[in-house]
């Protein structure tokens, strides 16, 4: 029987399945961080349980840490408690932790692939909604809640219902200047933020295959923003080249055997998908969100839609509420919108490729007078090290940007990087919800190049009109 890639991954990890019951899956890799793990470890202690397979769980510090200092003792309040708890819990159980004193530390969804912990064919979970990032490698990866974190620590398994399969094909090649971020925002704009609900999405097509692994991670990272359980891209030579010689990747004969298996991880030609969506790559322009969910997005050269022209009453009400919060009116040209801050970072766009794209725009230019701050936050210590080796940090600093240490930073208002009230931000992160970047902050999601351009021109511009240095 023909199967989709998702079906192959799911079926190969079933530990137990019975009629009328939710299947139990084996979990190959468990990633943890300081925010969603403390209660899980507390639960283990109360029940007098041990971590079942210590060598399959890895931790990092990312969400609540400061990107300005590397000293735990200088953290305050809840952030300090969370970081110290993670350190205590990993030491007590023997779990490997990449803490803020090591260059391997980073945002969990940057650190995992970078270390070769993310491999094709795996099941990967983490107490974080953007775990779908790892699906870029042909792994079944999804976010879980704190009680499930405890369950995986205790059993290395998880109850998981079968999802539907969706195929999203992006045909042909994108135009110059169009990035993975534009592709995924255009997809969400077409499907809406609920279009993938109940599905695991496989992204395919020439435009997807042309992406680097960094770009593929950006696409899968935001699968959750269209309501999907997970996102997948079948592994290929690009995947294998990225993984070869990574610290935790197989070596020698094991590598050869692994690649031979990984090459089988693709949907069968006659596999049936529950839902199929198609986009033409040539039609995708630079994207900018105008509202308060990632599905409220248009091309930079378009005007903000009129809610009164929307047939769906729910969509209309959502748009009206979004425009009121975001402080914009229907018919406004996106290129007339000025920004107060710029954030380049997050698990969506903080890898070396993203920083290179931003630096190419900012080189030889200065922060616009109306822009209060440009934050550039690498996704890991290794990304930071590579960027500094290439001199990217000097480009950012010369332009008037702040070059920070690794962390989630202004993606979410959980640390000391936040927007002021009603400030408008061009952000490379993945969510533009109300208050996401700080109380009453206004977020517009864009690619790294578009964010950098907004920082030096003071407003949104079409990156295709910008000369790169």
Swiss-Prot record:
<dbReference type="Pfam" id="PF00330">
    <property type="entry name" value="Aconitase"/>
</dbReference>
<keyword id="KW-0100">Branched-chain amino acid biosynthesis</keyword>
<feature type="binding site">
    <location>
        <position position="408"/>
    </location>
    <ligand>
        <name>[4Fe-4S] cluster</name>
    </ligand>
</feature>
<dbReference type="InterPro" id="IPR001030">
    <property type="entry name" value="Acoase/IPM_deHydtase_lsu_aba"/>
</dbReference>
<feature type="binding site">
    <location>
        <position position="411"/>
    </location>
    <ligand>
        <name>[4Fe-4S] cluster</name>
    </ligand>
</feature>
<dbReference type="InterPro" id="IPR033941">
    <property type="entry name" value="IPMI_cat"/>
</dbReference>
<keyword id="KW-0432">Leucine biosynthesis</keyword>
<dbReference type="InterPro" id="IPR015931">
    <property type="entry name" value="Acnase/IPM_dHydase_lsu_aba_1/3"/>
</dbReference>
<comment type="function">
    <text>Catalyzes the isomerization between 2-isopropylmalate and 3-isopropylmalate, via the formation of 2-isopropylmaleate.</text>
</comment>
<dbReference type="InterPro" id="IPR004430">
    <property type="entry name" value="3-IsopropMal_deHydase_lsu"/>
</dbReference>
<dbReference type="GO" id="GO:0003861">
    <property type="term" value="F:3-isopropylmalate dehydratase activity"/>
</dbReference>
<feature type="binding site">
    <location>
        <position position="347"/>
    </location>
    <ligand>
        <name>[4Fe-4S] cluster</name>
    </ligand>
</feature>
<comment type="pathway">
    <text>Amino-acid biosynthesis; L-leucine biosynthesis; L-leucine from 3-methyl-2-oxobutanoate: step 2/4.</text>
</comment>
<keyword id="KW-0004">4Fe-4S</keyword>
<keyword id="KW-0479">Metal-binding</keyword>
<dbReference type="InterPro" id="IPR050067">
    <property type="entry name" value="IPM_dehydratase_rel_enz"/>
</dbReference>
<keyword id="KW-0408">Iron</keyword>
<keyword id="KW-0411">Iron-sulfur</keyword>
<dbReference type="InterPro" id="IPR018136">
    <property type="entry name" value="Aconitase_4Fe-4S_BS"/>
</dbReference>
<protein>
    <recommendedName>
        <fullName>3-isopropylmalate dehydratase large subunit</fullName>
        <ecNumber>4.2.1.33</ecNumber>
    </recommendedName>
</protein>
<dbReference type="GO" id="GO:0046872">
    <property type="term" value="F:metal ion binding"/>
</dbReference>
<dbReference type="GO" id="GO:0051539">
    <property type="term" value="F:4 iron, 4 sulfur cluster binding"/>
</dbReference>
<dbReference type="GO" id="GO:0009098">
    <property type="term" value="P:L-leucine biosynthetic process"/>
</dbReference>
<keyword id="KW-0028">Amino-acid biosynthesis</keyword>
<dbReference type="InterPro" id="IPR036008">
    <property type="entry name" value="Aconitase_4Fe-4S_dom"/>
</dbReference>
<comment type="similarity">
    <text>Belongs to the aconitase/IPM isomerase family. LeuC type 1 subfamily.</text>
</comment>
<keyword id="KW-0456">Lyase</keyword>
<comment type="subunit">
    <text>Heterodimer of LeuC and LeuD.</text>
</comment>
